[in-house]
UniProtKB/Swiss-Prot annotation:
Fe cation binds at residues 254, 305, 372, 563. Binds 1 Fe(2+) ion per subunit. It is an enzyme of class 1 (oxidoreductase). Keywords: Chloroplast, Dioxygenase, Iron, Metal-binding, Oxidoreductase, Plastid, Transit peptide. It comes from Arabidopsis thaliana (Mouse-ear cress). The gene is CCD8. Residues 1-56 form a transit peptide. It is found in: Plastid, Chloroplast. This is Carotenoid cleavage dioxygenase 8, chloroplastic. Induction: Up-regulated by auxin in the root and hypocotyl.
Length: 570
């Protein structure tokens, strides 16, 4: 069945900003007639200068705030605001709502992601390099109070203090490492790398609410676990793990959190494998439930950005896209950055019992590349109540590693409108628990129905680890160089509904279930959208019909963000 494309005329661009506080991004910026940057001003910076070029400002709530003017740059194509840095460290204010917000929607949506891609005279290479920027949408009685703030990680504070890069980011290495000619410096850098000293704590990937109410920003380095105040967005400090596992450098960027516990994976670069760990709500101590040894024989474990759980099992991916110590130590990145592609070594999926830590299945599967698992559940084919097969769904990029290099900022900024986005699908793993050597990887829904793009997914959290029906994710309306649509995928009926507006780049669609709902898709979907004209807005879609029910425009453009969480009002 063909996708349903919901394309609506753009609503009015007028809005009201109230109780606004603004702080400029750099402490050495001046005000008045002086420039806030000595670099040539691109159009979005000109807007920032007009609106945000003051240390403190209060804007009359009765007067509409001007939007970015349509920018005209002679001789060059304007860069989409999704790939531009925020122009101030923090902002807060009320947004004017167009449409009607459900009365039951009371709480806070937080979104994390890279929001600053330059420091001093250095421009970062990759989407994943940017310094963490939190965005808040507080829903209260049909009103939306919004804010954003840069996370005060050690990496960001050091960069701001010294006006240069000081820690290794995803594709970036400090100049001090690159230019050091001392023959013994390489040994020192290995020590700093494996001790975690030189790795970033720039927690720019996800944000989670722990079972005890604490809110934590995360990235793939363990030191990049940072607590924040979800009301003020202020940084509280490092999450101090009370265990001996912190000597390992990296972790999954996407732990799985419930009201009672948190599960995560810790890759082992020395003895390639994965530790499966669990932490109870209210505790800072992680317990090792079990360990999986990599089957490939490679020098590094497969990249594990995310994983999945069922009611009784943990699903551990072992991709042929593997961590490479050689590439980790490089001063200049390769097209695969800190990884290498080893399809000749095989691809695997492991299944571990949550209760015993026993590996109950370890199967070889076709090669795959995935950032994000969607969900997993157990199937009982014999009808005796005992699981015989694990179904695990993910956003799978057709074993095409080009997606990593397509996220270079110069590519994103220069290829807008060109159909260069690599294909992706919902990949469905079937993992037998009968001792079989092989599992299956299938396409769950025809990829053309969601534009052959599929990532940044969410589900109804009440169906975590259970059989489910609906996936909310970023799809595409081609031609495009990045997912530019929101998709609701019915994996049972194999149907897709898409939301798309020309020139828009939406971030992860986050599903919030209606309290007391009896249908899986009874709720709302929240996304923050970056506009081609330099603006941005929050959009709410009905979880069932996937029709727009409300939007609220920011008074400035927000860059693209990654992952979010929902914090219900007490």
């Amino acid at each position: 069945m063909a996708s349903l494309i919901t394309t609506k005329a753009m609503m009015s661009h007028h809005h009201v900003l109230s109780s606004t506080r603004i702080t400029t991004l750099y402490s050495d910026n001046s005000i008045g007639d002086q420039q806030i940057k000595t670099k040539p001003q691109v159009p979005h910076r000109l807007f920032a200068r007009r609106i945000f070029g003051v240390t403190r400002a209060v804007i009359n709530s009765a007067a509409p705030s001007p939007l970015p003017e349509k920018e005209k740059v002679e001789g060059e194509r304007r860069c989409h605001v999704a790939w531009t840095s925020v122009q101030q460290e923090n902002w807060e204010g009320e947004l004017t709502v167009q449409g009607k917000i459900p009365t039951w929607l009371n709480g806070t949506y937080l979104r994390n992601g890279p929001g600053l891609w330059n420091i001093g005279d250095h421009d970062f290479r990759h989407l994943f390099d940017g310094y963490s920027t939190l965005v808040k949408l507080q829903f209260d009685g049909g009103r939306i109070f919004a804010a954003h703030r840069l996370l005060e990680s050690d990496a960001y504070k050091a960069a701001k203090k010294h006006n240069r890069l000081c820690y290794r980011e995803f594709s970036e290495t400090p100049k001090s490492v690159i230019i050091n000619k001392n023959p013994f410096s390489g040994i020192g850098e290995i020590v700093r790398l494996f001790s975690g000293e030189s790795l970033t704590d720039n927690a720019n990937t996800g944000v989670i609410k722990l079972g005890d109410g604490r809110v934590m920003c995360l990235t793939e380095t363990q030191k990049g676990s940072i607590l924040v105040d979800h009301e003020t967005l202020e940084t509280i400090g490092k999450f101090e793990y009370d265990d001996v596992l912190s000597d390992h450098m990296i972790q999954s960027a996407h732990p799985i959190v419930t009201e009672t516990e948190m599960w995560t994976l810790i890759p082992d670069l020395v003895k390639p494998g994965y530790r499966v760990v669990r932490m109870e709500a209210g505790s800072n101590k992680r317990e090792v439930v079990g360990r999986v040894r990599c089957r490939s024989g490679s020098w590094g474990p497969g990249w594990v950005h995310s994983f999945a759980v069922t009611e009784n099992y943990v699903v551990i991916p072992e991709m042929p896209l593997r961590y490479s110590v050689k590439n980790l130590l490089r001063a200049e990145p390769t097209p695969l950055y800190k990884f290498e592609w080893c399809p000749q070594d095989g691809a695997f999926i492991h299944v571990m019992s949550k209760l015993t830590g026993e590996v109950v299945a370890s199967v070889e599967v076709p090669a795959y590349v995935t950032f994000h698992f969607i969900n997993a559940y157990e199937e009982d084919k014999n009808g005796d109540g005992k699981a015989t097969v694990i179904i695990a769904d993910c956003c799978e990029h057709n074993a095409d590693t080009r997606i990593l290099d397509m996220l270079r900022l110069d590519t994103l900024r220069s290829s807008h409108g060109h159909d260069v986005l690599p294909d992706a699908r919902i990949g469905r793993f079937r993992i037998p628990l009968d001792g079989s050597k092989y599992g299956k990887l299938e396409t769950a829904v025809e990829a053309e129905k969601h534009g052959r793009a599929m990532d940044m997914c969410s589900i109804n959290p009440l169906y975590l680890g259970q059989k489910y029906r609906y996936v909310y994710a970023c799809g595409a309306q081609r031609p495009c160089n990045f997912p530019n649509a929101l998709s609701k995928v019915d994996i049972v009926e194999k149907k897709v509904k898409n939301w798309h507006e020309h020139g828009m780049i939406p971030s992860e669609p986050f599903f919030v279930p209606r309290p007391g709902a009896t249908h899986e898709d009874d709720g709302v979907v929240i996304s923050i959208v970056s506009e081609e004209n330099g603006g941005s807005f929050a959009i709410l879609l009905d979880g069932s019909s996937f029709e727009e029910i409300a939007r609220a425009k920011f008074p400035y453009g927000l860059p693209y963000g990654l992952h979010g969480c929902w914090i219900p009002k007490d």
